[in-house]
């Protein structure tokens, strides 16, 4: 019988196969992969954000183009641009009183909103209870896709005990008529070249009881601002004053602005400073919801232009005057 001789050494241990451990990651390798992925995401996110904002700005430009086209169609049929606001007398206060029928109301048939036009009772005014369902209707072409604000404004209700709940109608002041809920417009017509109340002697294209014709635009339609974006400064809650947005049917600062300034919502509430309007006669300038601060606008010839907040103030003022006889600069932020 053959006997196996002991060598005195422990039996050999087979080393693990290289193929068996090839699929596993070490901790260092995993951390490297995570770091690479984080870097790629950090590089791609700004590009994605910029692409989305560019798409929103293009949609906003299309809204402005459609409004400009509607104004031109109105002028073609009526031989004059619509009144910026229709009322018995001015100056116009940004408070829910009077008729205050806006230029947007006149444009409803040209914005494919014939149903709203038929149901709006112009003789009753923008704040009449009979017009509540109409003025609470959101019109998509009046909303900027980049807006951080809502498309509907809720008017506050106050009583002697302080702010009332939104659904309360107790002690509704008689000077604050219905409706309390209104749809807004992020676009406004140009009523004047400097800060001034909305009145019949304004220098812009759309103002109190106006009926501007092309022959009245002595500076040239391509050099006269027709409409542009606007942003609203913040207002304290439960305070009804000149800061309230009275909706697209109201021919107040809700739908009319001047070329005194271009504001960007990207600067935040602090950018408004002392220009927060407390006086109901205050109108304010145009503004933008876009990240870049670009304000999309339409000229009187229908062309769509883009302004920046750092536009030359003199150039901006000149564009807001239809017949000042001055030659606007060819640069300066437009």
Predicted regions and their residues:
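Generic low-complexity, intrinsically disordered sequence content enriched
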Residues: 8-9, 31-35, 71, 260
